[in-house]
């Protein structure tokens, strides 16, 4: 079946459908990872986005339940150069096409993904849509132009859990950790659990005072989709957490929320960072880590002496982490849990545990 990718400037790419035969609109982004398409598709940070995978051949190793980063596909659509329908992997339980159809997600193959990626890199991430149809219709562009975009949209409330839950085991764990779910990835929870925390996950709008009354030793602010600026409830809760001096760790959107809570500003990036090869310098140690990233907004450095940058992106010098003088705080813009991506930064989970332990000892 034919499929059309339509951008908001009227550009049309014609290809072939290999997902569910439907239509979908969203922000068009690209990810440079060579593998990890299942983890990428199920990452809640991709809510309302259509993903272009720059690696030219996708689907080679199929789908396996262990690689899910949430309970379903979160992206609005998928764009690839060439889809492989015969995966070679003894663990594979279904094809990528079957996976997409199961969750009713459209996908298009056979288009020039290099041309599309260059367009995004030059012009920024456009709104667009995938339309499965036998022929093009002018209504496709009208539907794309009606998409409101992700700026000033609270997408965390779309992907957050509806009720609190315990992750992993609490038996024998020394510290209770409250995780705010703004779109948390499963591997983040796995690593928090594996590094000794008794993890309880809370809906995004849970008042921090309520969690404090229940009892916790520290807070974690998760990754998530879209613009942090409209998340007033998250910023207010974070400020109250910091007033009470709880140890605090934020990843990706969580890092941005902490930045806003400190009075900093965020900005929409031209095309963001999405892939598993972003070099980041640890300004404390001087070491360079290769990181996995997925974000389209960034914290602006306000050069406050008591809130220095802790990590710096070496490609475009954007802020990748911030500190607060005298406060037990750890933030990173990137994804230390990888899934997919390199494991250079997984030490941060143990570092946070040590920070909590040090804080509790006084």
Curated annotation (Swiss-Prot):
Question: What Gene3D superfamilies has UniProt attached to this entry?
Answer: 3.40.50.880, Carbamoyl-phosphate synthase small subunit, N-terminal domain
State the residue spans of region: CPSase: 1-172
Q: Which UniProt keywords apply?
A: Amino-acid biosynthesis, Arginine biosynthesis, ATP-binding, Glutamine amidotransferase, Ligase, Nucleotide-binding, Pyrimidine biosynthesis
The Gene Ontology terms for molecular function here are: ATP binding; carbamoyl-phosphate synthase (glutamine-hydrolyzing) activity; glutaminase activity
Q: Looking at the record's lineage, which domain of life comes first?
A: Bacteria
- Which InterPro entries does this UniProt record tie to the protein? Anth_synth/Amidotransfase, CarbamoylP_synth_ssu, CarbamoylP_synth_ssu_N, CarbP_synth_ssu_N_sf, Class_I_gatase-like, CPSase_GATase1, GATASE
GO terms (BP aspect): 'de novo' pyrimidine nucleobase biosynthetic process; 'de novo' UMP biosynthetic process; glutamine metabolic process; L-arginine biosynthetic process
Write down the top EC class of this protein.
ligase
Q: What is its EC number?
A: 6.3.5.5
Q: Which organism is it from?
A: Leptospira interrogans serogroup Icterohaemorrhagiae serovar Lai (strain 56601)
Q: Which reaction does it catalyse?
A: hydrogencarbonate + L-glutamine + 2 ATP + H2O = carbamoyl phosphate + L-glutamate + 2 ADP + phosphate + 2 H(+)
**What positions constitute the catalytic site?**
252, 335, 337
Q: Partners and quaternary state?
A: Composed of two chains; the small (or glutamine) chain promotes the hydrolysis of glutamine to ammonia, which is used by the large (or ammonia) chain to synthesize carbamoyl phosphate. Tetramer of heterodimers (alpha,beta)4.
**Which residues of the sequence carry a binding annotation for L-glutamine?**
45, 224, 226, 253, 256, 294, 296-297
* All copies of domain Glutamine amidotransferase type-1, residue ranges: 176-362
UniProt-listed SMART domains? CPSase_sm_chain
Q: Does the keyword Chloroplast apply?
A: no
This protein is called: Carbamoyl phosphate synthase small chain
């Amino acid at each position: 079946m034919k499929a059309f990718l339509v951008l908001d400037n009227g550009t049309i790419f014609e290809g072939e459908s290999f997902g569910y035969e439907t239509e979908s609109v969203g922000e068009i982004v690209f990810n440079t990872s060579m593998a990890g398409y299942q983890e990428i598709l199920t990452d809640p940070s991709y809510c309302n986005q259509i993903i272009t995978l720059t690696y030219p051949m996708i689907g080679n190793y199929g789908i396996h339940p262990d690689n899910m980063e949430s309970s379903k596909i979160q992206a609005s659509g998928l764009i690839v150069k060439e889809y492989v329908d015969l995966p070679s992997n003894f663990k594979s339980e279904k094809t990528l096409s079957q996976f997409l159809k199961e969750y009713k997600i459209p996908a298009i193959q056979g288009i020039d993904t290099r041309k599309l990626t260059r367009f995004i890199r030059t012009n920024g991430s456009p709104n667009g849509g995938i339309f499965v149809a036998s022929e093009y219709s002018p209504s496709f562009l009208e539907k794309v132009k009606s998409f409101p975009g992700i700026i000033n949209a609270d997408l965390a409330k779309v992907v957050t859990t509806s009720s609190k839950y315990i992750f992993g085991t609490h038996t024998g764990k020394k510290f209770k950790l409250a995780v705010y779910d703004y779109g948390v990835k499963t591997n983040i929870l796995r690593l928090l659990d594996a590094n000794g925390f008794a993890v309880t996950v809370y809906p995004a709008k849970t008042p921090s005072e309520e969690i404090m009354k229940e009892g916790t030793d520290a807070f974690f602010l998760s990754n998530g989709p879209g613009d942090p600026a409209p998340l007033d409830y998250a910023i207010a809760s974070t400020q109250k957490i910091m007033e009470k001096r709880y140890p605090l760790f934020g990843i990706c959107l969580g890092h941005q929320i902490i930045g806003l809570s400190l009075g900093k500003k965020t900005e929409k990036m031209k095309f963001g960072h999405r892939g598993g090869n972003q070099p980041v310098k640890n300004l404390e140690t001087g070491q360079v880590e290769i990181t996995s990233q997925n974000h389209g907004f960034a914290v602006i450095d306000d050069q406050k002496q008591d809130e220095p940058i802790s990590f710096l992106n070496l490609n475009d010098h954007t802020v990748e982490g911030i500190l607060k003088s005298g406060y037990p705080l750890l933030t990173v813009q990137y994804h230390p849990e990888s899934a997919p991506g390199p494991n250079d930064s997984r030490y941060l989970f143990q570092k946070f545990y040590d920070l909590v332990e040090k804080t509790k000892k006084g």
